[in-house]
Amino acid sequence: MSVLTFFRRRPPRHSGPKRVLVPFTGGELDPVVLDAAIRVAQAEDATLVPAYLIVTPLEYALDTPMQHEVAVAMPLLEAVEHAALRAGLAVDARVETGRTPTHALHRLWDAERFDRIIAPAPAGGGHGFTPKELQWILVHAPSETLILRPDPTLAKGFRLARTLDAVA
């Protein structure tokens, strides 16, 4: 897994539990990224905030219900919630709309505070944020941001010599 970390400025200290935002779009969240986000939230004793970002086309009003997108988002958010609850984490799932994924993120950042943001980068041509969107996230994020990109060979089902058995 590749990790890119960008420190913008030291976020102001807030009272209350820490919050780790994991935004995703495109109908999937890579399980490797989810596992890493859960481990980070556990280490920081934080609430995991998975956020499904819905892109609303220009021909619709921004607050138009996107029933098909919500039908895709809810099972994904439930799966993330179950995984986090099994790990003993508090979960506060979100669905946010916008004209683009970055617009939806901006709307979410304006409404709530987050102590850390973990954004998934696509592996092997999968769904997710584009390189341009990831760059925007790094520049505009209000708190410490990690970009996680799973090993593309793992996405294809190939295991490289990464286990102790393979190395020995």
Where in this protein do the model-derived segments appear?
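Aromatic/hydrophobic pocket-lining residues that form π-stacking "cages" and hydrophobic walls in ligand
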Residues: 37, 80, 105
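Glycine-rich, Arg-bearing micro-motifs that act as flexible, cationic patches
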Residues: 118-141, 154-158
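Short, surface-exposed alpha-helical segments at coil->helix boundaries
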Residues: 66-78
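Short, well-ordered secondary-structure micro-motifs
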Residues: 33, 60-63, 104-106, 129-130, ...
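Structural beta-alpha unit
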Residues: 1-13, 86-117, 122-123, 135
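Small/aliphatic-rich secondary-structure junction motif
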Residues: 9-67, 92, 140-151, 164-168
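A conditional alpha-helix N-cap/helix-loop micro-motif detector
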Residues: 30, 73, 98-99, 127
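Conserved hydrophobic residues forming the short capping helix/wall of the S-adenosyl-L-methionine
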Residues: 41, 80-84, 109
